[in-house]
């Protein structure tokens, strides 16, 4: 199984919105995210599932990935909201055990995505994986089931600047 962590694109300033969850992508954020998604599609990446945080900027990012034909319509997962639960996600992930070759992408927020990737790849977190906006981390598991620090490999960590034309 391959598990990708995709941080939402550049969002509007917090000061302009009463609720953090209402902040949309900026025009620049939308444009950059579309370019990154197009590049991932050109590289032949395709996800069997797109899971997104309920916050607007993450949902918009997930929709961009789906529109670029990288995967199906996104599914909202409350556990991907800021300060979400890795345990709840791993429990949800069990439904994919029958599809060991699946590629799934999680669209969410920092520092959570970086911490989750660290916990799964290394068994601990140390705030070392800095995921830029519209950046992506890829983990591969040799096991039928992804668990924290069990035969998992970090194979991709890239900033959007390396994917933009």
Swiss-Prot record:
Keywords: Hydrolase
Tagged with keyword Hydrolase: yes
SMART domains the record matches: PGAM
Matching CDD domains: HP_PGM_like
InterPro entries per record: His_Pase_superF_clade-1, His_PPase_superfam, SixA
GO molecular function: protein histidine phosphatase activity
EC number: 3.1.3.-
Top-rank lineage group of the source organism: Bacteria
Coiled-coil region list: none
Keyword Zinc among record annotations: no
EC category name: hydrolase
Entry-linked Pfam families: His_Phos_1
GO cellular component: cytoplasm
A biological-process GO annotation: protein modification process
Family to which the UniProt record says this protein belongs: Belongs to the SixA phosphatase family.
Database matches in NCBIfam families: sixA (TIGR00249)
Record's protein name: Uncharacterized protein SYNPCC7002_A2622
């Amino acid at each position: 199984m391959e598990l990708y962590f995709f941080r939402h694109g550049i969002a509007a300033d917090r000061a302009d919105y009463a609720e953090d969850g209402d902040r949309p992508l900026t025009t620049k954020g939308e444009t950059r995210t579309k370019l990154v998604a197009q590049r991932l599609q050109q590289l032949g990446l395709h996800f069997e599932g797109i899971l997104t945080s309920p916050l607007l900027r993450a949902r918009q990012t997930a929709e961009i990935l789906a529109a670029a034909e990288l995967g199906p319509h996104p599914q909202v997962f409350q556990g991907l909201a800021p300060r979400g639960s890795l345990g709840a996600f791993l429990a949800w992930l069990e439904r994919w055990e029958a599809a060991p070759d699946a590629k799934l992408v999680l669209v969410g927020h920092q520092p959570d995505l970086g911490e989750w990737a660290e916990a799964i790849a290394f068994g601990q977190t140390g705030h070392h994986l800095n995921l830029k906006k519209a950046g992506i981390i890829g983990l591969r598991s040799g096991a039928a089931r992804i668990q924290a620090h069990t035969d998992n490999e970090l194979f991709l960590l890239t900033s959007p600047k390396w994917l933009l034309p």
